[in-house]
Structure formats: C-alpha cells, structure tokens
Amino acid sequence: MEVGWPFFGEVCRALALKVSREYDPEVVLGIAKPGVIPGVVVASILQRDFASMALTRREPGALPQLVAGPPASVRGRRVLLVDETCNSGDTLKLALNEVAALNPKEIRTAVSFRTGPYEPDFYAFETDKLILLPWDREIIEGDQLVLRPEYAHLIEGSR
C-alpha cells in the first residue's frame, strides 16, 4: 500500500485525536528513524515535548538492536512511544523495556499503521498490506532521485 504525504498527514491527525481522547502524555518519544516522523507530527498536534531514541535492524527479519537509548528526561513523566508501523512488536517491546528502565510515570504506545498481531495502545490505520511510506519511496543514486529498487515491483504492480 503506497502512502502519499497528504494521506500520511491525515493518519497522523487521526492518531493524535485517538491519543488525546484517552491519554495525556507529557512527552512524545519517536523511535528513529521512521517513528520520528509521525512522532514529531503527533507531538506538535498535542503540543507536547518531543524526544527520540534509535533502534535498527541490521538485516530484514533480524531482531532490533538499540543504537541510542531514550533521554533521561522521560523519568517520572507520562510517555507516548511512537513508531510508524507495528507487526511483530519486536521494536516496540525493546523500546518499552529501554524506556521502562528510566522509571517513567506511565508509557503507552502508538503507531501510524498496525500491520500484524502485536497490538499497540493506539493505532490510526490497520492493514495486512506492506506499507510504502513517502520518505522510503525514493533514494539518491549519483545525482538523481530514483525509485528505490526493492520497491519498484510493488509500485509498478499496483498500477
């Protein structure tokens, strides 16, 4: 499922509304890289502080690894942990453990797209399709923006 910028904006607005109806975070913590983008948008809409932490998967299917932990400023605060998608929950589980070690007052999770069995506290959209986000669509090769080769067949096949 190819997601354009306008639809992504609507997804972030919907996510912020869902969160605001049930939770009042003091800080929104985005999981870098992809969760930072919806995290910043949600934090801005909710008028809350924003921070980030970084996890990575060295290879597709590998377990995530911590690159940079959450800031100490989450201690004693209500935290909303944001990522862009959630399938297995491996990334959110690792992030939750890292944040919990800093003794926040409360942690809840939010994702733009729920794509699998793991259920975050909040999600804006649910699908079983692969999500192609606008910032993942193109890369630079030489001095040109080109369609990311591993996604070309998905985009061309959907037209």
Residue ranges of model-derived segments:
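Conserved glycine-rich SAM-binding loop
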Residues: P34
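PRPP-dependent phosphoribosyltransferase catalytic core
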Residues: N97-R159
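Short, well-ordered alpha-helices that flank and scaffold nucleotide-derived cofactor binding pockets
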Residues: L17, V40, S44, N97, ...
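Active-site-facing substrate-recognition patch
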Residues: M1-P25
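Short, glycine/charge-rich flexible loops or terminal/linker lids adjacent to PRPP-binding catalytic cores
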Residues: S44-L80, S88-N97
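Glycine-rich phosphate-binding loop signature in dinucleotide/nucleotide-binding domains
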Residues: R21-D24, S73-R75, L102-N103
